[in-house]
A protein has these predicted regions:
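Non-catalytic accessory segments flanking enzyme active sites
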Residues: 7, 13-14, 175-177
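A generic structural signal for short, non-catalytic loop/turn and secondary-structure boundary residues
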Residues: 12-13, 36, 105, 114, ...
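Aromatic-enriched hydrophobic runs in primary sequence
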Residues: 12, 31, 46, 67-69, ...
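A general structural signal for short secondary-structure junctions and capping/turn motifs
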Residues: 9-10, 33, 111-113, 244-245, ...
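C-terminal catalytic domain of Rieske-type non-heme iron oxygenases
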Residues: 50, 127-321
Length: 321
């Protein structure tokens, strides 16, 4: 037991951008209570269409803004006494029965980006402002691309463990039934926040013969945000975009989006979505029952995993192994 407790180091939450909702889920004037990063939060869309995220509890008497709160212009109104809080700054903008607003009347307002079909929040353990950005995916909503298919799942895992899978080609043989370990290479971008994995496409599905010379290109930004594209399919393409968000240290909410060029979506789209959901279900028992080895015993074939561990350290405010 002592060894297990020592090795099962509790990883803190990494800093970065994480999805807190699908864009399509939040209409104008909607107010939704959400729980991420170990925090009670409130997500709402202002009358001008901006998605906002603030801490949940009113500084007045502690009412939860997400249960009965209403959008008033660019603010969210507390259901208890009607105090209104600006979604961008968090400052109290109005008290209906008092002209003077106390200086401490504010809630924390989180930095939010809305792109690629999702609403993202910036998390930082020290509440520092965003330190890096991530790109728009032109495929999502593109004229030649299909309406995205989506899938999501809440899992008992740490976000780093789920992301580490991308750097573990060997597990595809033993967990997913691949006949071989796909050859792959990793390129780390010079800014340090992004890396790319290029691997041969190994498939046993009915469309394997069409993809035998193609490659999978995985781009990642921070811990938990990934875009997987196909390369080498003449005149066609696929994109799988995903964000895995910490709910607590050992509980995550993963969202996946799949889109394909319209000329192949009927042939490939449904099969890829089935493959995605099947793959996650195969990984789930491992993630559910594994511990985090802070100092794993690597063999010489674990080069990608060792490189990933070193790269991932930069996203934590406190030292991690």
């Amino acid at each position: 037991m002592a060894l297990r407790e020592k090795e099962d180091d509790r990883l803190p939450l990494p800093n970065g951008w994480f999805a807190v909702a699908w864009s399509k889920e939040l209409g104008e004037g909607d107010v939704e209570p959400v729980h991420y990063f170990g925090e009670e939060l409130v997500l709402f869309r202002t009358r001008s269409g901006q998605a906002r995220l603030v801490d949940a509890y009113c500084p007045h008497l502690g009412a939860h803004l997400g249960h009965g709160g209403r959008v008033m212009g660019e603010t969210v109104r507390c259901p208890f006494h009607g105090w209104q809080f600006d979604g961008q700054t968090g400052a109290c903008a109005a008290i209906p029965y008092c002209e003077r607003i106390p200086a401490r009347a504010r809630v924390r307002a989180w930095d939010v980006l809305e792109r690629n079909g999702m609403i993202f929040a910036w998390y930082h353990a020290e509440q520092k402002p965003p330190e890096w950005d991530f790109p728009v995916m032109p495929e999502i909503g593109g004229a030649e691309w299909s309406e995205p298919r989506t899938f999501e799942l809440v899992m008992p895992a740490h976000v780093q463990d789920t992301h580490e899978n991308n750097n573990d080609p060997v597990h595809f043989q033993f967990v997913h039934g691949s006949l071989e370990t796909p050859p792959s290479s990793i390129e780390y971008a010079t800014d340090g926040r992004h890396y790319r994995i290029v691997s041969d496409f190994v498939s046993q599905g009915p469309w394997a013969k069409y993809l035998e010379k193609s490659k999978l290109v995985r781009d990642s930004w921070g811990i938990g945000l990934t875009a997987v594209r196909t390369e080498g399919i003449p005149g066609a393409g696929l994109l799988m975009y995903s964000s895995t968000t910490p709910i607590e240290e050992k509980r995550v909410h993963s969202r996946w989006l799949l889109t394909a060029t319209k000329n192949i979506v009927d042939f490939f789209g449904e099969e890829f979505m089935k493959g995605l959901t099947q793959g996650v279900q195969q990984d789930l028992p491992i993630w559910t029952h594994k511990v985090h080895r802070a100092r794993p015993v690597f063999c010489e074939a674990d080069t990608h995993l060792a490189e990933f561990r070193k790269w991932a350290r930069q996203f934590y405010s406190q030292p991690v192994a």
